[in-house]
Design a protein with these regions (language model features):
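Well-formed, non-transmembrane alpha-helical positions, independent of function
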Residues: 24, 71-72, 90, 176, ...
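Secondary-structure end/capping motifs
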Residues: 129-200
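Extracytoplasmic/periplasmic, Sec-exported soluble proteins
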Residues: 4, 17, 31-39, 61, ...
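A broad structural signal for alpha-helix termini and local helix breaks/kinks
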Residues: 50-51, 95, 165-166
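Short, glycine-/small- and polar/acidic-enriched structural segments
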Residues: 1-55, 60-62, 79, 85, ...
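Pocket-lining segment of extracytoplasmic ligand-binding domains
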Residues: 67-160
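Predominant activation on well-ordered alpha-helical scaffold segments within soluble catalytic domains
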Residues: 44, 89, 195-199
């Protein structure tokens, strides 16, 4: 692992005002996708750490895709969902009154346990890194500068994101970027955050 490039992009969204804290999820039904991966592990961990038994105190209605969660919200079959960006912003544009109730990255950080909610890393083969240390260092410096530029220039970055087909429309990309937690964390800070996160999992 060369760097952490994305912190949490997961949010609890709600069509209503019931959910103001993790505790408010008790007794609720949450539609979600990502069973057996980061969304499930993060949600179960945060519920447990907030005194909520994920198997008894909430109902998690697992869907196969995030778009199914958005459809359930849009049809009124669900009022609370776990969604990643950019699905959150897309859903908010389609569903009047849908709000980001909880930022799971912020909720994770409140636990102050030395770990961080990580959803993306940059990896490389050890033999390539060892054979090309200068190129790897240059790449990481350029990557860090790129991250800094994107975070400081959302409108310009959104144009490029749309141009390269990452997100279809630049206005949506511009709305999404502030909530994507794009970072470039390397060295000992990366090791601490990553090892803490992996221990939690």
């Amino acid at each position: 692992v060369l760097a952490v490039n994305t912190l949490g992009v997961l949010y609890i969204v709600e069509n209503g005002e019931t959910v103001q804290s993790m505790a408010d999820l008790k007794g609720q039904t949450i539609v979600a996708a990502g069973k057996g991966s980061t969304p499930e592990y993060a949600l179960r961990y945060l519920l447990t750490e907030n005194g909520i038994d994920p198997d008894k105190d909430v109902t998690i209605d697992w869907k196969s895709e995030h778009s199914e969660c958005v459809a359930a919200l849009a049809s009124g079959q669900a009022s609370i969902a776990l969604l990643p960006q950019p699905f959150v912003t897309v859903a908010q544009n389609k569903i009047e009154g849908l709000r980001m109730a909880l930022d799971l990255t912020a909720e994770w950080d409140k636990l102050d346990n030395g770990s961080g909610l990580i959803t993306g890393v940059i990896v490389a083969r050890r033999d390539v890194v060892e054979a090309n240390p200068g190129a790897v260092d240059s790449f990481l410096q350029n990557y860090a500068a790129s991250v800094e530029w994107v975070n400081a220039n959302n409108a310009d970055a959104a144009q490029l994101i749309a141009e390269y087909g990452i997100i279809e429309a630049a206005p949506v990309a511009e709305m999404v970027l502030p909530y994507c937690n794009i970072v470039c964390i390397t060295g000992s800070e990366m090791k601490d955050k990553l090892s803490g996160y992996l221990q939690v999992l």
